[in-house]
């Protein structure tokens, strides 16, 4: 069993630390919330007066904090982790922070001779309690291999996202998609109500289409990702259908700002001559808008 320092005992961190204890690991904990520390001490953890004390003699130091500034302060501030850290220890940041902050933290740790990787998590606090988190590991092959037994005490699935900083990048993309889709789903649900359409009917239909399953696994693989833009569903038709939905929403006084923004992207694609291409070619349009080179010839 490993000697672990766990810093950050919030809604996610506390149950994650508890699962490490249940697996028999030696845990030294620190948090500014004394009650959160007491909760873990009652389960067998050892309290630390500061991050440096928590890190002393630890093989792994796990940080699970609300933002990147706090992570930096915990690592490099007064009585920070670096003051008590041994050079053979591995720091694992599991916080959700800005990727560029992660890159700088890892670089600064390396400059001091320390090892650090990023492993943000997916799923919810309920999964943190049951030890079924999705673990998104960004690190060297050696770091991922070394950390895996510790990480799997807190999760049920580990994805090796690639090198250092890649874990937080895939977490960022996943969060962007799920959070934006939550708002777009709300627009669709409210339009459903305004049209007096039974919600269960809409759910039944969408659960079997790209609307419910997402384009990454439905419309894209056999089209734009395979270099094929021949239309299964033309951008011109998608633009028309989206326009009808927005017109109906406007008549019913249902605000749909995300839908309107989406239609603008389709309008740009049509203006670029993509109207008769498959709707998955929207990926190429957004690439070009981002200053990148399209991967599929028009």
UniProtKB/Swiss-Prot annotation:
Matching Pfam families: NAD_binding_11, NAD_binding_2
Alphabetical list of InterPro entries matching this protein: 3-OH-isobutyrate_DH-rel_CS, 6-PGluconate_DH-like_C_sf, 6PGD_dom2, 6PGDH_NADP-bd, HIBADH-like_NADP-bd, HIBADH-related, NAD(P)-bd_dom_sf, SLA_reductase
Residue numbers annotated as active site: 171
Annotated Gene Ontology cellular component terms: protein-containing complex
Annotated GO biological process: 6-sulfoquinovose(1-) catabolic process; 6-sulfoquinovose(1-) catabolic process to glycerone phosphate and 3-sulfolactaldehyde; protein homotetramerization; toxin catabolic process
GO molecular function: 3-sulfolactaldehyde reductase activity; 4-hydroxybutyrate dehydrogenase activity; identical protein binding; NAD binding; NADP binding; oxidoreductase activity, acting on the CH-OH group of donors, NAD or NADP as acceptor
EC number in record: 1.1.1.373, 1.1.1.61
Primary role: Reduces 3-sulfolactaldehyde (SLA) to 2,3-dihydroxypropane 1-sulfonate (DHPS). Metabolite profiling studies showed that the enzyme also catalyzes in vitro the NADH-dependent reduction of succinic semialdehyde (SSA) to 4-hydroxybutyrate (GHB), and that it could be involved in the metabolism of SSA, and other potentially toxic intermediates that may accumulate under stress conditions. However, the enzyme exhibits a 42,000-fold greater catalytic efficiency for the reduction of SLA over SSA. Shows no detectable activity on the analogous glycolytic intermediate glyceraldehyde-3-phosphate.
Family, similarity comment: Belongs to the HIBADH-related family. 3-sulfolactaldehyde reductase subfamily.
Protein name per Swiss-Prot or TrEMBL: 3-sulfolactaldehyde reductase
Organism: Escherichia coli (strain K12)
